[in-house]
Amino acid sequence: MKRNLYLLLAVFGFLCCVGQLFTVAAHNNGYHTRNIFTPETIPWGPVPPFINPGAQLAVLEGDPTASTGDYTVRLKMPDGYKIAPHWHPLRENVTVLSGTFKVGMGDQFDTKKMAAFTEGSFAFLDPDMHHYAMACGQTIVQVHGQSPLQFNYVNPDDDPSRRR
């Protein structure tokens, strides 16, 4: 009886492992590719009106304009691209994927007070933290946070949506 129980447990464990293998194979064969992006399939598009034109944005997960929920976006910026001093009401997590992303804290854009973050760097910015940024070389950052993504410019005249 005890031997039969062990045999039954062994067979059950084996079947669970086989089931997992089929699940992994199904994912790898494209059944869930809408959740997977390679560099070639990233859906780059224009930035929203409240971000300076010239960069490209890709929404990878969620909806940054929704009233709630998580989002993940990538921002591709050309060399010299600047983001004026601003703040967000919700936390922002930033990972530098390529290039150099310079970030400064405060209400005035000052290149002497900026720290350089290179590929692989990560930072999280608490709500209401005033900051500004600049790309050195073509730079790609991934930003993750909670919706809605809101930019509040320290100087309202820096808001590009007012100039469009």
Segments predicted by a language model, with ranges:
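A short, N-terminal "cap"/entry segment at the start of jelly-roll beta-barrel domains
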Residues: 24-69, 156-164
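Glycine- and acidic-residue-biased ligand/ion/polar-headgroup-sensing regions
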Residues: 78-81, 88-108
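Short acidic-glycine-tyrosine-enriched beta hairpin
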Residues: 80, 107-128
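Positively charged n-region of N-terminal signal peptides that target proteins for export
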Residues: 1-4
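Bacterial N-terminal signal peptides
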Residues: 8-20
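Double-stranded beta-helix
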Residues: 33-35, 112, 134-164
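Short beta-strand His + acidic residue motifs that chelate non-heme Fe in jelly-roll/DSBH
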Residues: 83-85, 103-104, 125, 130-136
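N-terminal post-signal-peptidase region of extra-cytosolic proteins
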Residues: 57-61, 73-81, 85
